[in-house]
Amino acid sequence: VHIPDGRKVGEALSRVTHLGVGAHQDDLEFMAFHGIVECHDSDSQWFAGVTCTNGAGSSRSGAYSDHTDDQMQEVRRAEQNLAADIGKYAAMIQLDHPSAAVKDTGDTALRDDLLEILRLTRPRVVYTHNPADKHETHVGVTAATIEAIRRLPADSRPQTVIGCEVWRGL
């Protein structure tokens, strides 16, 4: 867990009001821009991000054309943490699941991780991918997010859940 302002993890997570749950590094800054901006420099609202995959399948061209999967994971992790620093997030959590596991509806590890994050943060607003998204990894993240929310007691669920489009058209 990356905490841009250096607070303890429990304190950082307990102040979250807006939570973005995205499949890949850089998804959050497109799909949850509203929440990031709304919380930026606020004393009463805090954005936290969750990136579910490890970045191993990232595109490789130009300066990255010779990078291994491990090297790309480090590059993407550093990029996402820098975005959290710039956006002054309460926290940035990178779960490092392989994309294949996220797309596997029988694999409950992501859902369980998200359930724990939701319990610790208790956000009012959750941003995730659009359920009609064409990207299978995005749909896997959406399904796991909704399943995790539905496992929470009704009084612990977010007030608002927003499905956002970030990749091509619907």
Kindly label every feature range from the protein language model.
Residues 21-23, 50-52, 95, 127-129, ...:
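Active-site neighborhood of phospho(di)ester-bond hydrolases with catalytic His/Asp-centered motifs
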Residues 1-19, 100-170:
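Metal-dependent de-N-acetylase/amidase catalytic core
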Residues 50-53, 82-98:
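A conserved beta-strand->alpha-helix junction
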Residues 73-81, 142:
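Short, surface-exposed alpha-helical segments at coil->helix boundaries
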Residues 14-15, 19-71:
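ATP-dependent adenylation/pyrophosphate-handling site
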Residues 44-45, 89, 156-160:
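A short helix->loop->beta-strand "cap" motif at the edges of active sites that frequently abuts
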Residues 72-75, 86, 90, 107:
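His/Asp/Glu-rich metal-coordinating catalytic cores
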